[in-house]
């Protein structure tokens, strides 16, 4: 109780202790002057927002929740994936893998699929957590999962990307041309499955065969500029990404050629698509969210909104639901914007750790997870709005 211990936890390895610091020594002024503390006053400005329920898992959470059939599925740093009631947050069941879970799971047809750093991909019964199948790979599996028409798409760190039948656990196809590891949530668009990796490349594969259709890379060399953390979106024949080079890019979905690319707004690793597929959204690295047209062949900015979240680099995607753009930040702040104007509708702070991509159930309800271990359901009553 009187010390802080520092550990290094490399993926796939046991945590290693690096140091310890006593909490009994006075290493700061007693007045605390000049040392700002976490501020939750924003919640008083927006009383229409509240937490219907909040659960503290006790472990760090690095992924978004998955939602299916009124249930919430969350993987954590202990290697456990747990199922909660979306109504009240009560835990229904928990299944333990051997190492941490980094990627966002997906659930459909009573099967929940996820990857683990223990080098396996799992399929569980979504109702009771019973193991249905397990696929062993050759490296930690950190990628998020997308399920479409009974097929799960997921990338690993073994230079492979797989399509898996979720009922049988059979690998439908495997693409072994990936040069780096994968963390993103794959996009299924028309006949393609699209994903980035930490190897500079954005890949497009035939979703039925796994054959490479095209591979995109533009900009500075080096894997640290890869469009690997962003979850790609697509509409009107174009794929949209944002990368660490602070560029927002539209790519021809058929050819893999760049349609337009702009650094005007200094966005980074976030992109979202409007429900009518006419607009895209992205967070900038300082305070703002921007909106661009998804229909033009040039970068047309529609609006920019000063949300006031400060310096920002969390790869948490903006998501539109029923005319509201839901977003989150590295400092525990969530917000809602008018999708057509960018007007700030609400903000709410639940902690001081990174909030992963939100999962709105409607414009009034939103699931969230935080790196600090929190899982919850946010409720917004738009009839109550005292904010001026």
Where do the protein language model's features map onto the residues?
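Short loop/turn segments that connect beta-strands within beta-propeller blades
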Residues: 10, 85-88, 125-128, 165-169, ...
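Extracytoplasmic beta-rich repeat domains
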Residues: 12-66, 78, 92-108, 131-148, ...
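Beta-propeller domains
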Residues: 76-80, 84-86
């Amino acid at each position: 109780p009187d010390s802080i211990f520092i550990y290094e936890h490399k993926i796939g390895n046991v945590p290693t202790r690096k140091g310890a610091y006593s909490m009994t020594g006075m290493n700061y002024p007693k007045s605390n002057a000049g040392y700002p503390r976490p501020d939750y006053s924003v919640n008083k400005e927006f009383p229409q927002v509240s937490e219907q329920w909040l659960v503290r898992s006790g472990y760090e959470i690095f992924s978004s929740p998955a939602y299916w059939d009124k249930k919430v599925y969350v993987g954590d740093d202990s290697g456990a994936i747990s199922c909660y009631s979306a109504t009240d947050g009560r835990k229904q069941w928990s299944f333990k893998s051997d190492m941490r879970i980094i990627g966002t799971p997906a659930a459909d047809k009573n099967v929940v699929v996820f990857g683990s750093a223990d080098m396996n991909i799992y399929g569980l019964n979504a109702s009771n957590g019973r193991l249905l199948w397990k696929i062993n790979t050759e490296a930690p599996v950190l990628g998020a999962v997308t399920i479409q028409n009974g097929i799960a798409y997921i990338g690993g760190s073994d230079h492979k990307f797989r399509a898996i039948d979720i009922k049988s656990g059979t690998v439908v196809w495997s693409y072994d041309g990936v040069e780096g590891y994968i963390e993103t949530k794959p996009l299924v668009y028309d006949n393609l499955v699209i994903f980035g990796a930490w190897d500079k490349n954005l890949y497009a594969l035939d979703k039925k065969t796994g054959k490479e259709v095209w591979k995109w890379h533009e900009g500075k060399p080096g894997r640290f500029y890869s469009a690997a953390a962003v979850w790609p979106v697509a509409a009107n024949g174009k794929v949209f990404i944002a990368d660490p080079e602070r560029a927002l890019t539209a790519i021809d979905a058929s050819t893999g050629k760049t349609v337009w690319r702009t650094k005007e707004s200094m966005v980074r690793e976030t992109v979202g698509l409007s429900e009518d597929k006419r607009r895209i959204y992205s967070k900038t690295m300082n305070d703002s969210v921007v909106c661009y047209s998804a229909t033009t062949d040039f970068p047309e900015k529609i609006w920019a909104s000063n949300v006031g979240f400060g310096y920002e680099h969390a790869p948490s995607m903006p998501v539109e639901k029923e005319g509201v753009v839901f977003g989150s930040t590295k400092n525990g702040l969530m917000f809602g914007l008018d999708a057509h104007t960018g007007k700030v509708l609400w903000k709410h702070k639940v902690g001081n750790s990174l909030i992963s991509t939100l999962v709105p159930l409607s414009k009034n309800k939103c699931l969230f997870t935080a790196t600090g271990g929190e899982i919850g359901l946010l409720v917004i009553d738009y009839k109550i709005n005292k904010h001026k």
